[in-house]
């Protein structure tokens, strides 16, 4: 491999060096042409640090959050160094089929002018069809662990000596129970392969895996504080548990997002919320792990093509999705941890565009949100759920259907009230019952628990959102199996 970059240090933090352009990174003209045609202007921090290291043939361990441009960080140097020798030269292992397809699309796009051929291997697709694709001599294979291991055990992949192996979203593979599969897969791989490990977090099992499979790696760390950038406005709303679905509907009405993702904790919850929104005539679709492959792909395509503008999804199913134009992210519940929160809100505010991240919390989740806010070192603003405004009431009245029972009730009420008086009373009642979430006095009581809790206010709240800012807190050795390759020595 030709080395056209100066020697690199063994550790690179996100404050090192000035920011170069893609032209400074050592990429070929044909690759640069695809980069600029794809709309890239300058490298992200992870791309700036990783691309030269990969081009030099060094093993890399990189810690960076989802949404930082990791795919291009390993894809561009891989594409740059392909030899087109009719073998699988690079292997990318990733936790989910959606992410595998996303990476395959990205490599195809970035390899446009080098005619890069890829194959995507994942569960839920015909084994026979995958074998047919593999026989067409792709240069890059993108695979999920389970299906890849199945192909290797059954000796369905020939000419399999990848020079570069990428582990993407390594911590997610750990969470999904794939670590044993990963270690077994490495028994089939050439010991001299260049290994690139990418992970949002570095739990101990991932560190131990890195010690086993990486040789004198370049270490790259992009601080999480770079993720919660100023392009993403972060808000939260305090609600009662039973108000979640109504709160999402109200916020969709008042925020009017162009395209939004609503994250739920469970598959059942995703289905229920999607069905609720669809019943209210929202263009909604769902995405979760219990859906079959055809339905999952249909949901993603509907969202990409704007046939649906609300995607209700679980964390795992949406991992790695890179869909442009997402203006809003909603957390139906407070995420279970900071990593999940950062991953979720990273779906918006991309490529220099503005985004909005909104989280619904109950009074019981309030303290956990404050803890999370300190960890991400970013301000999250508190807002009240807006009340229904005049335009919404007019639209509701316009769309309402009048039944015979309502006509009968109207006749009874007009015997008691004048028609004009009746309308005023019904409108007043509508405004009173339209309130969702805690009002300002109730929220103040949560913020200052030592003070006497005021009685809930029944006065009409203003018909606009009132912001209240929160202050931030003070605050390889490998043992190769015999496949169709000869035995390989341990990597030291």
From Swiss-Prot:
Annotated EC: 3.6.4.13
Any single Gene Ontology cellular-component annotation: cytosol
Main location: cytoplasm
SUPFAM superfamilies registered for this protein in UniProt: P-loop containing nucleoside triphosphate hydrolases (SSF52540)
Amino-acid positions noted as binding ATP in the UniProt annotation, renumbered to this chain: 64-71
Function in brief: DEAD-box RNA helicase probably involved in RNA degradation. Unwinds dsRNA in both 5'- and 3'-directions. Background RNA-dependent ATPase activity is stimulated about 5-fold by RNaseJ (rnj). Stimulates the dsRNase activity of RNase J.
Family label: Belongs to the DEAD box helicase family.
Protein name stated in the entry: DEAD-box ATP-dependent RNA helicase RhpA
Natural source organism: Helicobacter pylori (strain B128)
Encoding gene, per UniProt annotation: rhpA
């Amino acid at each position: 491999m030709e080395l056209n970059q100066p020697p690199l240090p063994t550790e690179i933090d996100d404050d090192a060096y000035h920011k170069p352009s893609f032209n400074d990174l050592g990429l070929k003209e044909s690759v640069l042409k695809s980069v600029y045609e794809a709309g890239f202007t300058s490298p992200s921090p992870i791309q700036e640090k990783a691309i030269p290291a990969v081009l030099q043939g060094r093993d890399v361990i990189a810690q960076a959050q989802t949404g930082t441009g990791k795919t291009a960080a390993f894809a561009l140097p891989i594409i740059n160094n392909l030899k087109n020798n009719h073998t699988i030269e690079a292997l990318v292992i990733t936790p989910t089929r959606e992410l595998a397809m996303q990476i395959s699309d990205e490599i195809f796009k970035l390899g446009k002018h080098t005619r890069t051929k890829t194959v995507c291997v994942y569960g839920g697709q015909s084994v026979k069809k995958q074998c047919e694709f593999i026989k067409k001599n792709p240069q890059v294979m993108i695979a999920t662990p389970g299906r890849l291991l199945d192909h290797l055990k059954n000796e369905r992949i020939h000419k399999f000596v990848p020079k570069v192996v990428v582990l993407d979203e390594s911590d997610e593979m750990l969470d999904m129970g794939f670590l044993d599969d990963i270690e077994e897969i490495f028994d089939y791989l050439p010991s001299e392969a260049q290994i690139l490990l990418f992970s949002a977090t570095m739990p101990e099992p991932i560190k131990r895996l890195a010690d086993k499979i990486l040789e004198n790696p370049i270490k790259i760390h992009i601080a999480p504080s770079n993720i919660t950038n100023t392009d993403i406005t972060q808000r939260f709303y305090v609600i009662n548990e039973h108000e979640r679905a109504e709160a999402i509907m109200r916020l969709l009405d008042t925020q009017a997002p162009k395209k939004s993702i609503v994250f739920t904790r469970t598959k059942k919850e995703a289905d229920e919320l999607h069905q609720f929104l669809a019943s209210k005539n929202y263009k909604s679709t769902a995405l979760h792990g219990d859906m079959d492959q055809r339905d999952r792909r249909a949901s993603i395509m509907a969202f990409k093509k704007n046939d649906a503008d609300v995607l209700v999804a679980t964390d795992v199913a949406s991992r790695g999705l890179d869909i442009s134009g997402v203006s809003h992210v909603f957390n139906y519940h407070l995420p279970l941890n900071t990593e999940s929160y950062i991953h979720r809100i990273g779906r918006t505010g991309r490529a220099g565009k503005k985004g909005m991240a909104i989280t619904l919390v109950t009074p019981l989740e309030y303290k956990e949100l404050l803890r999370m806010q300190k960890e991400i070192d970013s301000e999250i603003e508190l807002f009240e759920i807006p009340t229904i405004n005049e335009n919404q009431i007019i639209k509701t009245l316009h769309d309402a259907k009048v039944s015979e029972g309502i006509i009968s009730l109207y006749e009874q009420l007009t015997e008691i009230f004048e028609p004009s008086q009746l309308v005023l009373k019904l409108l007043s009642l509508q405004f009173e019952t339209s309130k969702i979430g805690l009002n300002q006095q109730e929220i103040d009581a949560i913020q200052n628990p030592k003070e006497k809790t005021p009685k809930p206010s029944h006065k009409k709240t203003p018909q606009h959102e009132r912001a209240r800012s929160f202050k931030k807190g003070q605050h390889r050795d490998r043992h190769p199996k015999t496949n169709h390759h000869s035995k390989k020595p341990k990597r030291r």
